[in-house]
Amino acid sequence: MTNNNNSNSNQLLVPGVQQAINQMKEEIANEFGVNLGPDSTSRANGSVGGEITKRLVRQAQSQMNGYTK
């Protein structure tokens, strides 16, 4: 399933996850004081994307730690 809201070619592997990703993006942007959109800088947008990645990795690591115990 492709994300039709953006012009990238990233594919979402879990159906219905786009809404959760968008919510996380908005929450992080608010925390960082970033206004997302075409007029914001790539640095500001990138900081939000980087934080999303960090949080998703942290969540996955927590889940994996739970499975290995």
Swiss-Prot record:
One of its GO terms (molecular function) is double-stranded DNA binding. One of its GO terms (biological process) is sporulation resulting in formation of a cellular spore. It holds the Pfam family SASP. The keyword Transcription does not apply. Keywords: DNA-binding, Sporulation. Signal peptide: none annotated. The keyword Ubl conjugation does not apply. The record marks 27-28 as: Cleavage. SASP are degraded in the first minutes of spore germination and provide amino acids for both new protein synthesis and metabolism. Belongs to the alpha/beta-type SASP family. SASP are bound to spore DNA. They are double-stranded DNA-binding proteins that cause DNA to change to an a-like conformation. They protect the DNA backbone from chemical and enzymatic cleavage and are thus involved in dormant spore's high resistance to UV light. This is Small, acid-soluble spore protein 1. It comes from Sporosarcina ureae.
